[in-house]
Amino acid sequence: DIAAIMFTSGTTGPSKGVLMPHAHLFLFGECLHTHMRITTSDKYYITLPLFHAQGLAMMTYGTMIAGASAVLKKTFRASTWIEDIKKYEITLTNLLGAMNDFVLAQPARDSDSKNHLRMVCALPVSDQTLHKLRTRFKIPKFFEAYGMTECNIPISRPFDAPDTAGCSGKVWDEYFEVIIADPNSDEELPVGEVGEILVRPKEAFCFMQAYNK
């Protein structure tokens, strides 16, 4: 059954409505539950909108699957981000794109590092930005992944992997097959060749069903 129609971010064109089966939404959350090792003792700070795959499918579902707690805010505010993190004793949160820079642009305070954060899903993030976040807020661990509203999160960085900025990790081969293919023939290309990313799910309903018409 279709759980929701979620709209894409519109990166490559007009935003499209994606028909999301229940299992598709669940697996988004299970990715974070598994690779960020969310437990009942965690508190997730959620500022992204619930009509976005990150806000609803990744963060909220991941929290519910783990039986953890969540603090949901109506909007993201860089000026109050670290104060909320400290006030609610937050252990996990996501910073998407420019949000990293907005947070770092706020006046630094000695108390910034006095927080309970154990991991942040920051994507995409550069080496310089990751270093600044780690140094200022004493964040011990970062998570990155590659995904789309349509195809879930087929590539993610295992919890024990090094924090290499810009590295999405490995294929989550329990649920997905991924190849780099020739865009004209769909034939798999040798390692090092530039091509198109093709993703195929191994489980039923863990992918978009169709675009809404």
Identify the residue ranges that each predicted region occupies:
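Conserved AMP-binding/adenylation subdomain of ANL enzymes
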Residues: F26-K43, F51-T91, Q106, E177
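Gly/Ser/Thr-rich phosphate-binding loop
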Residues: I65, I82, K87-L95, L104-A165, ...
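Alpha-helix capping/helix-boundary segments
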Residues: R77, M99-N100, S126
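Short beta-strand->loop structural element characteristic of the AMP-binding/adenylate-forming
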Residues: K16-L19, I46-T47, A68-T75, F143
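Beta->alpha turn/N-cap motifs
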Residues: L96-M99, E203
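Conserved AMP-binding A3 loop
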Residues: A3-L27, P158
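Short, well-ordered beta-strand segments
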Residues: A3, K43-I46, F51, I197-L198
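Conserved ATP/PPi-binding loop(s) of AMP-dependent carboxylate-activating enzymes
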Residues: D173, E187-K213
